[in-house]
């Protein structure tokens, strides 16, 4: 009779009053090896009384033609909440370190003991690809954001220089008009023409860079929150 589920982080226990079934690891070596691989538990060797509960299988994996729920011959477990298990193990590790620090004075031997305890716990935080891929993604996004910041700084400098030139030109033309050096109304024709020659494409690039930076920042926050 099954007592609990062998999946990492799964607390499901056998109860005849709930609609959850338990299934042994297959005897066929190839299928058994595939199940063990999908469970992703380090140094895990299932025994005769090792079970997985039905929560780790898709609905299409079950044969419901009989009175009992059975797995099909090609069924494999694919539903696991690995992220929750990692968080749980990290929390236990932090709590253990805090407890050790509060119960004993700090010293080289105690520090070594704490590190060893943490390593023992983290050894059971099974290796997954997703956290590593997330870390690489975060690093890439941070580099892209830094590049956009440099571009935006350059565009802002160009914008400030263009603005200063525009203000100086406007003041000069207005002053020449006031001293009758230029005829009245010259600024109304000259300044719009001068404005059209300014590098307005730089301002468009600045606007696009700001939008890209915002999108990358949102993407970075979502990626980090997934694995915190």
UniProtKB/Swiss-Prot annotation:
A GO cellular-component term linked to this record: nucleus
Zinc finger (THAP-type): 1-80
Name under which the protein is recorded: THAP domain-containing protein 2
PANTHER family: THAP DOMAIN-CONTAINING PROTEIN 2 (PTHR47696:SF1)
Transmembrane segments: none
SUPFAM superfamilies xref list: Glucocorticoid receptor-like (DNA-binding domain) (SSF57716)
Motif HCFC1-binding motif (HBM), residue range(s) on this chain: 123-126
Entry GO MF terms: DNA binding; zinc ion binding
Domain of life, per lineage: Eukaryota
InterPro entries tied to this protein: THAP2 (IPR026521), THAP_Znf (IPR006612), THAP_Znf_sf (IPR038441)
């Amino acid at each position: 009779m099954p007592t609990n589920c062998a999946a990492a982080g799964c607390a499901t226990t056998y109860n005849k009053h709930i609609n959850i079934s338990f299934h042994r690891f297959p005897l066929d070596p190839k299928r058994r090896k595939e199940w063990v691989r999908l469970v992703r538990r380090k140094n895990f060797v299932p025994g005769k009384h090792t079970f997985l509960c039905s929560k780790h299988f898709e609905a299409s994996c079950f044969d419901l033609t009989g009175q009992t729920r059975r797995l099909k011959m090609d069924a494999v477990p694919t539903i696991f909440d690995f992220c929750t298990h990692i968080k749980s193990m990290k929390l236990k590790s932090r709590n253990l370190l805090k407890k050790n620090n509060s119960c004993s004075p700090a010293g080289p031997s105690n520090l070594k003991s704490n590190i060893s305890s943490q390593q023992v716990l983290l050894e059971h935080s099974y290796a997954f690809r997703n956290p590593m891929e997330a870390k690489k993604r975060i690093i890439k996004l941070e580099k892209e954001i830094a590049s956009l910041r440099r571009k935006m700084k350059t565009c802002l400098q160009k914008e400030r220089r263009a603005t200063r030139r525009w203000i100086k030109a406007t003041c000069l033309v207005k002053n020449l008009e006031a001293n009758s050096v230029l005829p009245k109304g010259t600024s109304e024709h000259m300044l719009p023409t001068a404005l059209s020659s300014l590098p307005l494409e730089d301002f468009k690039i600045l606007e696009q860079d700001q939008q890209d930076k915002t999108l990358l920042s949102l993407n970075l926050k979502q990626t980090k929150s997934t694995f915190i």
